[in-house]
Each structure stands twice: as C-alpha cells, then as structure tokens.
C-alpha cells in the first residue's frame, strides 16, 4: 500500500516563481530517492474559516497564499529510507536551496493510503 507525505504552507504570493523553482528541484530529488510522484498546488479558492481552515492553520498573512502539496511513495519503508537521503542531499540544504517561505508554519505529516480510486 502506498504512503503519502502531506504538506501545507503559507508562501509569500510574490514568491510564486521562486517557490515553483524550489519545488521543481525538490521534486527531482524526492523522485531520485524513491518517491513515485510529487504534487504542488498553489491556492486558488481557499476560504478563511471561523473555527478552522487552511489559512488559519498556517497563519496565512494577507500577502501570502496557501500551498498544498503531497508526495507519494511505494511504501513507508521506502519513504523512511528515501527521506533520510533527501534530507542529506546537498541540493536541498538551506544554503543551496533556501525555502522561500516560513518553515516554522509548515504543517506536514505521513499517511497510510486507505483509498486510492
């Protein structure tokens, strides 16, 4: 059964092109280390909530856009091994490829896929 890493972040709207380049580099690295796919989505219709919402979860500011991303892996074992290699890869080190957003507000988690229709 596939495994998925999911991410939500608030990215400065003016940094969309910078974010895309960062994400393209990261996607190549993840795929080299075993990921099946990497999907990056730029917020288009992401309403603010009263109790909960994507914007509230990442403390999205007026000049930011919510980004929703996920990475699929063939298994948790492949993900665990691949993630170690990804984190050590020189192409994704902060001095080489800094995150174009506030990583302190990044939300992420690993999920077992239970339906894939």
Task: Annotate each language-model stretch with its function.
Residues 16-17, 28-34:
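Short, well-structured hydrophobic secondary-structure segments
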Residues 1-21, 25:
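Long, hydrophobic N-terminal alpha-helical segment
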Residues 31, 37-62, 88-117:
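Glycine-rich beta-strand-turn "strand-cap" elements at beta-sheet edges
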Residues 20-26, 82-90:
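Short amphipathic alpha-helices in soluble, non-transmembrane regions
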Residues 4-11, 49-86:
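Short, well-ordered beta-strand segments in beta-rich or mixed alpha/beta enzyme
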Residues 33-42, 73-75, 81-82:
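Conserved long hydrophobic alpha-helices within structured protein cores
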């Amino acid at each position: 059964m596939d495994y998925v890493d999911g991410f939500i972040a608030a990215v400065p709207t003016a940094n969309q092109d910078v974010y895309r380049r960062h994400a393209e580099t990261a996607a190549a690295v993840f795929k080299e280390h075993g990921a099946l796919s990497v999907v990056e989505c730029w917020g288009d219709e992401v309403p603010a909530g009263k109790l909960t919402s994507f914007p509230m979860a990442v403390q999205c500011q007026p000049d930011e856009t919510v980004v929703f991303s996920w990475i699929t892996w063939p298994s948790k074992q492949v993900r665990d091994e691949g993630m170690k290699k990804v984190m050590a890869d020189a192409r994704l080190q902060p001095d080489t490829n800094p995150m174009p957003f506030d990583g302190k507000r990044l939300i992420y988690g690993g999920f077992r896929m239970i339906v894939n229709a």
